[in-house]
Amino acid sequence: MTNIAQEILQTYLVAGTQDTGRENFLPILDQALQAGITCFQFRDKGPNSLPTDAMRSDYAKKAQALCRTYHVPFIIDDRLELALDLQADGLHVGQSDQPWPKIEVAKQHGLITGLSCHTAQEILSSHQQPALDYIGVGPIFPTNSKEDAKTPLGLAQLKAFTQLSQLPVVAIGGISLKNCQQVAETGVAGAAVISAITQAKNIPQAIQLLNQPWQSSEGNNHES
């Protein structure tokens, strides 16, 4: 059973320097926090990401300081040691990141824990892990933000998985200002985005539009 307030999952930014460029990363995050994102996951991974652990730690510390200023949860993707060193608010892991030992250790340290799922079997397996707080399901639509993205699930499958899950579901993958309302209507707890914010011409306006579906249906999430 999850121990977190589902509201923190509503407008969930996932980003690293590979999504913004190094110079723009912190200013974009600052704008996004000021405009009302509810959660931030530091995911610095893949081509054009930071080349050393020391640099990654430095950017993560600065991102964490911004998140604390705005009282927004700061989640680390995959890197348990970094999450523990920084006393991050949470850890998110994928199916290929040796998830269960990391989730258990993270929970022992009081961190929020999230796991990426793509199949019904992965969701059912998540029910056996009491240390897990939420799951990320995706990609929902085609996306260019992740090189290793799997086949898109679509809205009907997302709704079915949300009903199957005993935990709050965060949708991710190809979510945009145009389709976020449809995503919210599936009953998910929130939507995680990368380019919808990092590539937005007007970040405050983009976040206002991403927030809208949750504000108009407050309290109706996770319906069956």
Curated annotation (Swiss-Prot):
EC class of the enzyme, as a word: transferase
Residues binding 2-[(2R,5Z)-2-carboxy-4-methylthiazol-5(2H)-ylidene]ethyl phosphate: 143-145, 174, 194-195
Record key words, sorted: Magnesium, Metal-binding, Thiamine biosynthesis, Transferase
Record GO biological process: thiamine biosynthetic process; thiamine diphosphate biosynthetic process
Catalytic activity reported: 2-[(2R,5Z)-2-carboxy-4-methylthiazol-5(2H)-ylidene]ethyl phosphate + 4-amino-2-methyl-5-(diphosphooxymethyl)pyrimidine + 2 H(+) = thiamine phosphate + CO2 + diphosphate; 2-(2-carboxy-4-methylthiazol-5-yl)ethyl phosphate + 4-amino-2-methyl-5-(diphosphooxymethyl)pyrimidine + 2 H(+) = thiamine phosphate + CO2 + diphosphate; 4-methyl-5-(2-phosphooxyethyl)-thiazole + 4-amino-2-methyl-5-(diphosphooxymethyl)pyrimidine + H(+) = thiamine phosphate + diphosphate
InterPro entries recorded: Aldolase_TIM, ThiamineP_synth_sf, ThiamineP_synth_TenI, TMP_synthase
Listed GO CC annotations: cytoplasm
Cofactor(s) needed: Mg(2+)
Superkingdom classification of source: Bacteria
GO molecular function, one term: thiamine-phosphate diphosphorylase activity
Function: Condenses 4-methyl-5-(beta-hydroxyethyl)thiazole monophosphate (THZ-P) and 2-methyl-4-amino-5-hydroxymethyl pyrimidine pyrophosphate (HMP-PP) to form thiamine monophosphate (TMP).
Protein's UniProt name: Thiamine-phosphate synthase
Organism: Latilactobacillus sakei subsp. sakei (strain 23K) (Lactobacillus sakei subsp. sakei)
Source lineage: Bacteria, Bacillati, Bacillota, Bacilli, Lactobacillales
Gene name tied to this protein: thiE
